[in-house]
From Swiss-Prot:
Transit peptide, residues from-to: 1-25
Annotated binding of ATP, by residue: A121, S122, L123, Y124, L125, G126, T127, G128
Domain spans labelled PLD phosphodiesterase: 212-238, 461-494
Residue span of region Disordered: 322-346
Protein's recorded name: CDP-diacylglycerol--glycerol-3-phosphate 3-phosphatidyltransferase, mitochondrial
Species of the source: Gallus gallus (Chicken)
Biased composition (Basic and acidic residues): 336-346
Stated regulation of activity: Activated by calcium and magnesium and inhibited by other bivalent cations.
GO cellular component: mitochondrion
Organismal lineage: Eukaryota, Metazoa, Chordata, Craniata, Vertebrata
């Protein structure tokens, strides 16, 4: 029965590749034949078979979210609140940052002034002097809290990826152990390990490449009631010359509570770093790679969805009498009445929607919302979409090519790709991205869509590029009313493998729209439009082996 089920799965996967590489389809077909013949497992212990389930994305089950968009204004996006909590705030609480240095200085200031909580989620913490300075700031703030109170209030929770945070002799873990040893009651360090990296696969894949199977990729930096959403990691490059995006949400306790609970939920299903550099799971928790995978993913899904659903319920109740009075459609209170009534805050002009994507746990909210935004974008609307690694899912590519809005897609030129100049196989990764970019550009040209869909490459001497997200300009508007900002980069890994989180910021405030517009312009100013001549440059030559391998490995990056 197991062999028959496996064969059926492989045949479905192979059938799902109408436009995929024939070599991959053939590989899946051969694997299905081998499964159906029921050969002894020992004769099939090849690394290719172990990797086979990862060579193609799972059969997609998501369709565009049905929605009824309001005809005018930012409120047309209120359908998102059917999926996630909606946080209404004043635009004066939102600040868009522009540079790595500004991001780094803000992190230090926020750590030093934190009184109640510091919550940081990142892929990893670097090991250089700048990162050590951050750790020192944490230590000083914890020490002050300890001296000020017999029962100190400050709690520090750090969530990192296990594989990336454990790489090398000096790593994220060794950077943080002194904090655990000095403040064991106040500091928690959680290391997420993907449930997909287990068994022989875990033994066979080298340390440098095991992160390709799946990661904790969320980047949230939270201090009391202030929240920074970004795509930047806690590493010196992201503090100096690696361009990313960053937004600060100030004095936003409800949003801070949500992301605290989200990080806690992921932390609860993660390995806990101990003072002696060992790790262990919380008592009673299923192990991510030694325990039952299905049960582990079920528990993780329940924990995360509890956070989302409870926050959504709280927000509906909290704002019932201000700007969404009831599900029956009763009118909202006038602003002067709501301000006068029991000291309520004025009606918000900006709405924050947290979008979570954790495909290993069956959570695909960000994917649903992104696909719906692309689907519903009207004719003459403009979408500026940026990604440091251009490897869009087939669904996103089809929507871009098949819908009506204008697209300006910003991506990294090979020279500002984070893998440019890397040793070994990793050094060929920029060429793989060039190959993917060229294929997409050819599709655009074949459909005669060059005017509607334009690619632009970011290029800046001495810098690398890691910005991701989008800005949506409604038809006839010169300013964006919506942006997506956070960790997802619209690629296969982001959608299918990693844990991701971003926010949709919807605003009616012209000053905030101007901030977002200036952010977009500043990034795009460092770019040039891609044309057919771009791929004729010597630096864009892609070796044959890269062209052959890229279709097989594109689901890993």
């Amino acid at each position: 029965m197991a062999a028959a089920g496996g064969a059926a799965l492989w045949r479905r996967l192979a059938a799902w590749l109408p436009r995929g590489p024939p070599g991959l389809a053939a590989l899946l077909g051969r694997l299905s034949d081998r499964l159906s013949r029921g050969r002894d497992r020992r004769s099939r212990r090849s690394s290719w078979l172990l990797l086979a389930p990862l060579l193609t994305p799972p059969v997609p089950v998501i369709t565009a979210m049905p929605c009824s968009l309001c005809p005018e204004g930012a409120h047309r996006f209120q359908w998102i609140r059917n999926l996630v909590p909606e946080f209404g705030i004043s635009s004066s609480h939102v600040k868009v940052l522009s540079s790595p240095a500004e991001f780094y200085e803000l992190l230090k200031v926020q750590i030093k002034t934190a009184k109640q909580r510091v919550v940081m989620a990142s892929l990893y913490l670097g090991t250089g002097l700048l990162e050590q300075e951050l750790v020192n700031c944490l230590e000083e703030t914890l020490e002050k809290s300890l001296q000020a109170n017999e029962s100190p209030n400050l709690r520090v929770s750090i969530l990192l990826d296990y594989t990336r945070g454990s790489r090398g002799r000096k790593n994220s873990r060794t950077m943080l152990i002194p904090l655990l040893q000095r403040f064991p009651e106040q500091v928690r360090v959680s290391l997420f390990h993907t449930p997909n990296l287990r068994g022989l696969l875990k033994l066979l894949i080298p340390e440098r490449f095991n992160e390709t199977i799946g990661l904790q990729h969320i980047k949230v930096y939270l201090f009391d009631d202030n929240v920074i959403l970004s795509g930047a990691n806690l590493s010196d490059l992201y503090f100096t010359n690696r361009q990313d995006r960053y937004v600060l949400l100030q004095d936003s306790p409800e949003i801070a509570d949500f992301f605290t609970e989200l990080v806690d939920a992921i932390g609860d299903v993660s390995l806990q770093l101990q003072q002696d550099d060992t790790v262990q799971m919380m008592e009673g928790m299923v192990h991510p790679y030694q325990g039952d995978k299905v049960r582990y993913c079920e528990i993780a899904n329940q924990r995360v969805m509890e956070v989302i659903d409870s926050a959504r319920t709280r927000q509906e109740l909290l704002h019932a009498k201000t700007f969404h009075s009831s599900q029956q459609g009763s009118s909202m209170l006038p602003q002067h009445d709501s301000e006068a009534s029991e000291g309520l805050k004025p009606e918000p002009d900006t709405w924050i929607y947290p979008l979570i994507q954790m495909k290993p746990f069956g959570i695909q909210i960000d994917e649903m919302v992104t696909e719906t935004l692309l689907t519903e974008a009207e004719r003459d609307a403009k979408i500026y979409l940026t990604t440091g690694y251009f490897n869009l899912t087939q669904a996103y590519m089809d929507l871009i090519l098949g819908t009506r809005a204008e697209y300006r897609i910003l991506l990294a030129s090979p020279e500002v790709n984070g893998f440019f100049g890397a040793k070994g196989v990793a050094g060929a990764i920029p060429s793989a991205y060039v190959y993917i970019e060229h294929q997409f550009y050819n599709e655009v040209c074949c459909l005669h869509q060059q005017e509607r869909v334009q690619l632009q490459e970011y290029s800046r001497a001495g810098w690398t590029f890691h910005a991701k997200g989008l800005w949506l300009y409604l038809a006839g508007s010169s300013l964006p009313c919506l942006t997506l900002i956070g960790s997802p980069n619209f690629g296969y890994r982001s959608v299918h493998r990693d844990l991701e989180a971003q926010v949709a910021i919807v605003t009616e405030n012209k000053a905030l729209q101007q901030q977002l517009h200036q952010e977009q312009e500043q990034l795009y100013l460092c770019s040039g439009v891609v044309s057919s001549s771009t791929f004729e440059q010597p630096s864009r030559h892609v070796k044959l082996w890269v062209k052959l391998v890229t279709p097989l490995i594109k689901n890993f990056f």
